C-alpha cells in the first residue's frame, strides 16, 4: 500500500519545504490540507495552488471560519481565556480544529501518516501530536522540521535551491501565524528582548496615536455568547470580525510579551488581537454584574486553568472537558449589554445593564433611600476578623 501523508499546510516556509521532504522520506504521496480560519491576506486558492506546485498530489481547502468562531473562540470568550493573564490563545485555539480536519481527511483519503511543519522549540508540535494521539492514535506522525533539525536559515536556503514558490526570505525571517482571533509574530530581531517592534510588523491594528475619534460600541450577550453589536444581530464570527475592524482602527489589542512555553523556555511574542480583547473585556464586565461573588472568585481560577490546558495542547483531555462543563454552567445568567469606548489603544467600559444583574441600586447607594442595614456591620466585621485577631494576639505574645 502506498504511504499517504496528510500535511497541515499553511503555505509558509516550513510546510512548503515539508512537501518534497515528506515525499522523499516516505516514498509516498502528500495530501496538503489548508484550513481557512479567517486569516485573510492571501487567497486560499493561491495557497492550494502553491501546495500543488511544491509537489502535493492533492491540496484541500476547508472553510472552517464559522466552526472556529462558534466552537473554539466562543468557549474562550466564556472562559475569559488569557494565558498568563495576557495572551488570548491565538494559535493555541486553532490547533485542535486543524487536528480534527486532518484526521477526517486522513480517514477520507486513505492517509497512513499525518505531518506538521513545527520545530522542536515550539508549543505547536505538542498541540498537534497530543491531539492526534487523543483522536487518531493509529496514524503515524512525522515532523520533518523538528526531526531533521531544519533551522530557519537552512529551510530558506533549501527553498531557494529547489525554487519553492514561497515569499519568505532571509531578509524577512519572521514566523507569522494568524486567524480571525488574532495574529502572532515571532523570531527575527524580536529575539533580542531590547528591540522594540517596528511599525511595519503590525497588520491587524493601526497606530494607537493616530488621533481617530473615539468609537463607542454596545455589545449584547445571551448566556455568555455575543449576539448583537449596537443592536444588530450578529453571529460569533461576525462579532469577532467587526471588533477586529473597529478595535484595530483604534490600535486596540496589541501585545508584546515574553511567555513561558510548554517546552520549558521563555519566548518573546508580539500579538494583535483586537476582536478577541474587546469581546473578552466586554464579557468580563458583564460577568461582574451577573455572577455571584464566590462563584466569580472560583471561576477566575478555573478560567486561568482552562487557558493553561488549551495553551498546553490538552483540548481533548478529560480535565479540559470538565472545565468546559463548569464554565458553561456559570454562563446561564451572563445576559445583557456592555457599552465600551475604543480609543488610542484602550478599551474602556462605561455602561452595563442586565435583567439578570445582581447590582442593587438601593443597597449600593450612599444617598437617601439606602436600604443597607449598617447596624449589622459591626458584628460582621468582628466575626470576619476573629480568626486573624486571635492568631495575631498569639504571635505578639511569643
From Swiss-Prot:
GO cellular component, one term: cytoplasm
Swiss-Prot/TrEMBL keywords: Amino-acid biosynthesis, Arginine biosynthesis, ATP-binding, Cytoplasm, Ligase, Nucleotide-binding
Binding site for L-citrulline: 87, 123, 127, 175, 259, 271
Record Pfam families: Arginosuc_syn_C (PF20979), Arginosuc_synth (PF00764)
Catalytic activity: L-citrulline + L-aspartate + ATP = 2-(N(omega)-L-arginino)succinate + AMP + diphosphate + H(+)
Root EC class: ligase
BP terms from Gene Ontology: argininosuccinate metabolic process; L-arginine biosynthetic process; urea cycle
Keyword Transport in annotation: no
Its EC number(s): 6.3.4.5
Family of the protein in this entry: Belongs to the argininosuccinate synthase family. Type 1 subfamily.
This protein's name: Argininosuccinate synthase
Species of provenance: Corynebacterium kroppenstedtii (strain DSM 44385 / JCM 11950 / CIP 105744 / CCUG 35717)
Gene behind this protein: argG
